[in-house]
């Protein structure tokens, strides 16, 4: 089979395989993708706590069978509300029953490169921490799951098995919307990120490798003491934070094609919702309770959004829901253990927990296998300068000295047939599936070769293209040199014909641009466009007076310019207004201020509803205005506003009267 393939085809096929890097195969094979999985919900009813049950106290919740329960209807005491879940564990159920019935079956998914999560939900004092941690006599879900998972990894990763497995653990808490590393408490608040493939990760989170249950206990027990707990009126050891234990299982295939898998297990102990009227929380405890209730409220919003199919799911509204993005509506096999209490004083909390559990079981997750393929990458072949440029270009780059001292090249012996077939001989050890892929690739290359498709990736063809490019550049340089010589000849001819032109040309054109002196004309004055007539200044008669409107500082005033002093006058355009029209405009504005109504006053520029009312009120109290400048005496109109009013209205009126040059 190896000898039947052309040598060039085998080299290209080997390069295509060996040159491939790490490719994502998270959706490898439609048949291997698991079907959508619904969030499984189990309800655990804890027994009465010692000292809390009275003689006539009966539980408000009663189990019907292994999957259903009923609770009294608070609206109608003669009716009961029935709930059905995937599993129901009564007060006589043990830790082993809960673990074996609901948690243990999902551990196998981790060895398939899939994610799984277990959440303990319920009100404060319902037994969530006991379900997850337990006691030395009755271990909970976390120690049992780690013990079985480590045993599975030892069996699957033993010598002679196709996969090598490794397990790491991380432990964190979400306290008042801060992500804290319990393995390294000094790390501070950590951030939650999302990579390009949609995976949730926490940069800087400590990961401890574990190979046995003793390793797990050595890291987990001290970290558990770092979790924030506090005493309330309802619970002496109330968890004040959400605790998350993250266990990663990495698998590497020992033989080709060297696949890699990663499975993550989330074990989450949620803090309980609290009624501050009953817990008596104050100060710090009240702040902690607010953060807990807020995150649990957002968790309920996420569940409702997933069930209703809303376009936006509010994962980012809380650190807890952001971290649980894989568990609810994501790619994990999820188990929700709702813990409830039998006491009647917890009735409303129990109903709320059951309603949340009933909504959660409608959430659909879509698990997939986190698998990637790692192929060996060959080192790039280093080519010499002579092989890249060719013989002629290499001689030009070396120079005459190196060319004389160069030793003659020895003839290279042709490669043997076994050396030519060496890239393909490595394929004989591969599995049949990989060999089938290689054969299909060979057939594809053969079909392209039969159609005359050029193979431009060979070193000889690349060298020829490079040499052709260099030759084209050389021709372009020669053309530019010839053009430069022609231009220089023209310049010399012009210099010989006209010495004066030569001097001007040499000082302006042949001088470098960076050294040219640029003469800047005197800047023109900035003219403000006003509704006045623009005239060009004419030669005035002696001793004539011209009134010109000029700007000096922040105020405008009329100045007299003696036209008999021509050296002080500047050529240009000036703004002029007739004194008669100015007086007429002032009188018209004064009449309008004294006789006009508020509506008439609003027709003036810079006068609005408020200022018009102020003017009318001042006129009624103090009588008519004697001059336009009295407008400044009105309360609420400053001197600057009065000047702006005069400029806007008097000049506009003058323009309307058709003022001309004086």
Curated annotation (Swiss-Prot):
Q: Name one GO cellular component term.
A: kinesin complex
Give me the residues that bind ATP, please: 122-129
Q: Kinesin motor domain spans which residues?
A: 38-363
Q: What is this protein called?
A: Kinesin-like protein KIF22
Q: What does this protein do?
A: Kinesin family member that is involved in spindle formation and the movements of chromosomes during mitosis and meiosis. Binds to microtubules and to DNA. Plays a role in congression of laterally attached chromosomes in NDC80-depleted cells.
Please give the InterPro entries that the UniProt record associates with this protein.
Hlx-hairpin-Hlx_DNA-bd_motif, Kinesin-like_fam, Kinesin_motor_CS, Kinesin_motor_dom, Kinesin_motor_dom_sf, P-loop_NTPase, RuvA_2-like
Q: How would you describe the post-translational modification of this protein? A: Ubiquitinated; mediated by SIAH1 and leading to its subsequent proteasomal degradation.
Q: Which residues carry this modification: Phosphoserine?
A: 407, 422, 447, 541, 560, 578
Q: Please report any disulfide bonds recorded for this protein chain, giving both cysteine positions.
A: none
Which protein family is it in?
Answer: Belongs to the TRAFAC class myosin-kinesin ATPase superfamily. Kinesin family.
- Superkingdom of this entry's organism? Eukaryota
One GO MF term: ATP binding
Pfam families with a match to the protein in the record: HHH_3, Kinesin
Q: How does it assemble?
A: Interacts with FAM83D and SIAH1.
Q: Where is this cross-link: Glycyl lysine isopeptide (Lys-Gly) (interchain with G-Cter in SUMO2)?
A: 460
Spell out the PANTHER family in the cross-references: CHROMOSOME-ASSOCIATED KINESIN KIF4A-RELATED, KINESIN-LIKE PROTEIN
This protein's species is Bos taurus
Q: Name one GO biological process term.
A: microtubule-based movement
Keywords, comma-separated and alphabetical: ATP-binding, Coiled coil, Cytoplasm, Cytoskeleton, DNA-binding, Isopeptide bond, Microtubule, Motor protein, Nucleotide-binding, Nucleus, Phosphoprotein, Ubl conjugation
Q: Which residues form a coiled coil?
A: 460-498
Question: Where are the annotated segments for Disordered?
Answer: 389-423
Annotated localization: Nucleus; Cytoplasm, Cytoskeleton
């Amino acid at each position: 089979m190896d000898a039947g393939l052309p040598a060039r085809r085998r080299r290209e096929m080997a390069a295509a395989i060996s040159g491939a890097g790490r490719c994502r195969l998270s959706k490898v094979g439609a048949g291997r993708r698991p079907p959508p999985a619904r969030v499984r919900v189990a309800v655990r009813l804890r027994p009465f706590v010692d000292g809390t049950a009275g003689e006539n106290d009966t539980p408000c919740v009663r189990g019907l069978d292994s999957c259903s329960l009923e609770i009294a209807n608070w609206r109608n005491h003669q009716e009961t509300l029935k709930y059905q879940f995937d599993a129901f564990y009564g007060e006589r159920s043990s830790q082993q029953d809960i673990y074996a019935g609901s948690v243990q079956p999902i551990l196998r998914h981790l060895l398939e490169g899939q994610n799984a999560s277990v959440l303990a939900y319920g009100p404060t004092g319902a037994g969530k921490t006991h379900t997850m941690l337990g006691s030395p006599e009755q271990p909970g879900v976390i120690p049992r799951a780690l013990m079985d998972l480590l045993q599975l990894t030892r069996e699957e990763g033993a010598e002679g098995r196709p996969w090598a497995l490794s397990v790491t653990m991380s432990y964190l808490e979400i306290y008042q919307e801060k992500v804290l590393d319990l393995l390294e408490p000094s790390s501070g608040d950590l951030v939650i990120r999302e990579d390009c493939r949609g995976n949730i990760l926490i940069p800087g989170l400590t990961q401890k490798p574990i190979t046995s249950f003793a390793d797990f206990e050595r890291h987990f027990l001290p970290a558990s003491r770092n979790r924030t707990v506090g005493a309330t009126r309802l619970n002496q050891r109330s968890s004040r934070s959400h605790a998350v234990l993250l266990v990663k299982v990495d698998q590497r295939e020992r033989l080709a094609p060297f696949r890699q898998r990663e499975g993550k297990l989330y074990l989450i102990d949620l803090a309980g919702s609290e009624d501050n009227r009953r817990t008596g929380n104050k100060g710090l405890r009240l702040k902690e309770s607010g953060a807990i209730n807020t995150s649990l409220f957002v968790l309920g919003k996420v569940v409702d959004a997933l069930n209703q199919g809303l376009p936006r799911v509010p994962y980012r509204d809380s650190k807890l829901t952001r971290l649980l993005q894989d568990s609810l509506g994501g790619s994990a096999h999820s188990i929700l253990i709702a813990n409830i209490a039998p006491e009647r004083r917890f009735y409303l909390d129990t109903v709320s927990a059951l309603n949340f559990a009933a909504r959660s079981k409608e959430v659909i997750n879509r698990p997939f296998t986190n698998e990637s393929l790692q192929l060996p990458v060959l080192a790039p072949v280093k080519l010499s300068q002579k092989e890249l440029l060719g013989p002629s270009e290499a001689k030009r780059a070396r120079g005459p000295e190196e060319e004389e001292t160069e030793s003659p090249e020895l003839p290279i012996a042709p490669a043997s047939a076994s050396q030519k077939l060496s890239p393909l001989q490595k394929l004989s050890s591969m599995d049949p599936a990989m060999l089938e892929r290689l054969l299909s690739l060979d057939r594809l290359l053969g079909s392209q070769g039969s159609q005359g498709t050029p193979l431009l990736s060979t070193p000889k063809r690349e060298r020829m293209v490079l040499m052709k490019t260099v030759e084209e550049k050389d021709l372009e340089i020669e053309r530019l040199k010839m053009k430069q010589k022609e231009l220089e000849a023209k310049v010399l001819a012009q210099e010989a014909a006209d010495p004066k032109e030569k001097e001007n040309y040499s000082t302006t054109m042949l001088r470098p641009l960076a050294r040219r002196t640029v003469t800047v004309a005197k800047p023109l004055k900035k003219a403000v466009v006003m509704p006045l007539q623009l005239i060009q200044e004419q030669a005035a008669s002696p001793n004539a007076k011209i009134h010109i409107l000029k700007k000096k500082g922040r105020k405008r005033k009329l100045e007299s310019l003696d036209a008999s002093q021509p050296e002080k006058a500047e050529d240009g355009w000036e703004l002029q207004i007739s004194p008669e029209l100015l007086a007429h405009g002032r009188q018209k504005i004064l009449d309008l201020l004294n006789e006009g109504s508020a509506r008439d006053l609003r027709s003036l520029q810079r006068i609005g509803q408020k200022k018009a009312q102020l003017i009318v009120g001042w006129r009624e109290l103090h009588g008519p205005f004697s001059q336009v400048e009295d407008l400044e005496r009105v309360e609420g109109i400053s001197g600057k506003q009065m000047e702006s009013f005069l400029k806007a209205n008097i000049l506009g009126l003058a323009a309307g009267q058709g003022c001309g040059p004086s």
